[in-house]
C-alpha cells in the first residue's frame, strides 16, 4: 500500500476507534487479528479480542472518551505517526487497567492529556499501535498519584534547582553525545 493509503487507514482508525463516536466494527475492519497494542497507561494487549475488551472497559468507565489528532500524520514505509490529545470524564464503571491503582465507579474526575502514537500498517491492517503518552498527567488528574512530588510546586522538576545553578540554565548549549 502507498504511504497515503496507510495514512488513510490510520486516520479512519483514529476517528472511529479513538474518536467521540466509537465504532466497534472498525476493530475487525482495520486491526490485524494479532495486533500488538501498547500504551504506558495500560497493560500490553495482543489480538483483536483483547483490544475490543479494552475499548469496551475504557469507554464504560469514561463514556465521553474522545481523542483527536493535533497535527498532520507523518508516514514512512509501513509506519504512520500521529500526535493527539483528548480524554474524558470518569462517570461510569470502576476502572482498574492502570499501572498504579484503580478507580471506583463514577468518580467524576476528568483526565485530559497528550501523546504520540506509532502505528504499523501492513496490507491495509494495523499490526502495531504503540503509544507514548503523558500518562503522569492523566494519573495525577485521576488522583492516582500526587499532584506534586515531595512538596514541589506542580510545574517544578526535581532537577530544577540544579538546572538554575548550571550553565545550561543560563542559555548554554546542550552537551553533545557525539564521540
Protein language model regions, located:
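C-terminal and inter-domain tail/linker signature
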Residues: 1-179
Amino acid at each position: 500500500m502507498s504511504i497515503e493509503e496507510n495514512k488513510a487507514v490510520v486516520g479512519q482508525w483514529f476517528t472511529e476507534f479513538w474518536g467521540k463516536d466509537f465504532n466497534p466494527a472498525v476493530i475487525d475492519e482495520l486491526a490485524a487479528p494479532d495486533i500488538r497494542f501498547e500504551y504506558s497507561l495500560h497493560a500490553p494487549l495482543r489480538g483483536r479480542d483483547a483490544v475490543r475488551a479494552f475499548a469496551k472497559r475504557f469507554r464504560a468507565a469514561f463514556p465521553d472518551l474522545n481523542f483527536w489528532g493535533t497535527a498532520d500524520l507523518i508516514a514512512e514505509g509501513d509506519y504512520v505517526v500521529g500526535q493527539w490529545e483528548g480524554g474524558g470524564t470518569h462517570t461510569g464503571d470502576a476502572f482498574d487497567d492502570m499501572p498504579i491503582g484503580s478507580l471506583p465507579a463514577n468518580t467524576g474526575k476528568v483526565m485530559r492529556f497528550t501523546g504520540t502514537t506509532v502505528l504499523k500498517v501492513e496490507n491495509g491492517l494495523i499490526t502495531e499501535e504503540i503509544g507514548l503518552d503523558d500518562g503522569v498527567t492523566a494519573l495525577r488528574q485521576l488522583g492516582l498519584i500526587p499532584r506534586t512530588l515531595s512538596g514541589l510546586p506542580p510545574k517544578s522538576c526535581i532537577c530544577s534547582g540544579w538546572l538554575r545553578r548550571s550553565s545550561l540554565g543560563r542559555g548554554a548549549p546542550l552537551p553533545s553525545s557525539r564521540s
